Amino acid sequence: MKKKIAEYEVGEQVDIFLLIKTATKGIASNGKPFLTVILQDPSGDIEAKLWDVSPEVEKQYVAETIVKVAGDILNYKGRIQLRVKQIRVANENEVTDISDFVEKAPVKKEDMVEKITQYIFEMRNPNIQRLTRHLLNKHQNEFLDYPAATKNHHEFVSGLAYHVVSMLDLAKAISNLYPSLDKDLLYAGVILHDLGKVIELSGPISTTYTLEGNLLGHISIMVNEIGKAADELQIDAEEVLILQHIVLSHHGKAEWGSPKPPLVKEAEILHYIDNLDAKMNMMDRALGRTKPGEYTERVFALDNRSFYKPSFHN
């Protein structure tokens, strides 16, 4: 079986079909234009530069284009890159479907839906349960397909649902340890906190921000969605306000994107759970591409650190 992009090591030659995830234009120090492209297959993605690009070439190499690339893998300032020697757009008879080139969550959608539904059934507060079920049903198709982000963590097909399932399991374990926590609020917060991303983001492949995403952001979007759901369900209770606060504050601080800090116990815990699961995903994926006794490439969202994989970890 042909190697995937994440399986290549520094110094190895590459001759492979990949999907352009993103393509960003820049101007080099010599004044000439270049493209920074993120290329992907189901194993992950890698950055590459296309130098001295003409307007015609720029139009060729856009997001969602499958290309045949030849080059070699290098480590540039702690980041793994693909140095391109040859590149061309793939012919129709060479490749089948874009979906063959995208990374997907390691759990089936049906299994994730079943697990999330079970957590909703465990809720005892009828207002919280009805609001959560209503909003999940409204956005379920997109929720099961979309990534949790454009980069950094869970940025793959069904990544949003996978992130939520992991967080729910964390929330359950923490609630069992600290029984004073309101499980209903915490579970609902986990399910709803990033649900606005189905409106903020463009879709599961070559994900970008929508107009609403750029102008409002997923936090504001979801606060409004909770308010609309409450009106539709004729729920006029404090639970609505608390759920809105939990979503509004889950980034923790204004400089991290939350207009208000957590002022409810469950909001504070949700912030930690979200942060923990995102960071674990980043570390696990970086370490999964690393041999024992070596360091990962730099992880930008974790203070640009390289993590060591102990030699006794196989």
Curated annotation (Swiss-Prot):
Disulphide-bridged cysteine pairs: none
HD domain: residues covered: 163-279
InterPro entries assigned to the protein according to its UniProt record, in alphabetical order: 3'-5'_exoribonuclease_YhaM, HD/PDEase_dom, HD_domain, NA-bd_OB-fold, NA-bd_OB_tRNA, YhaM_exoribonuc/phosphodiest
Pfam family of the protein (one): HD
Chain coiled-coil ranges: none
GO MF annotation terms: 3'-5'-RNA exonuclease activity; DNA binding
GO biological process: rRNA 3'-end processing
Key words of the record: DNA-binding, Exonuclease, Hydrolase, Nuclease
EC number: 3.1.-.-
EC class (word): hydrolase
Known DNA-binding region: 14-90
Lineage: superkingdom: Bacteria
NCBIfam families xrefs: PRK13480.1
Family of the protein in this entry: Belongs to the YhaM family.
UniProt cross-references to PANTHER family, sorted A to Z: 3'-5' EXORIBONUCLEASE YHAM
Record function comment: Shows a 3'-5' exoribonuclease activity.
Record-given protein name: 3'-5' exoribonuclease YhaM
Species whose genome carries this gene: Bacillus cereus (strain ATCC 14579 / DSM 31 / CCUG 7414 / JCM 2152 / NBRC 15305 / NCIMB 9373 / NCTC 2599 / NRRL B-3711)
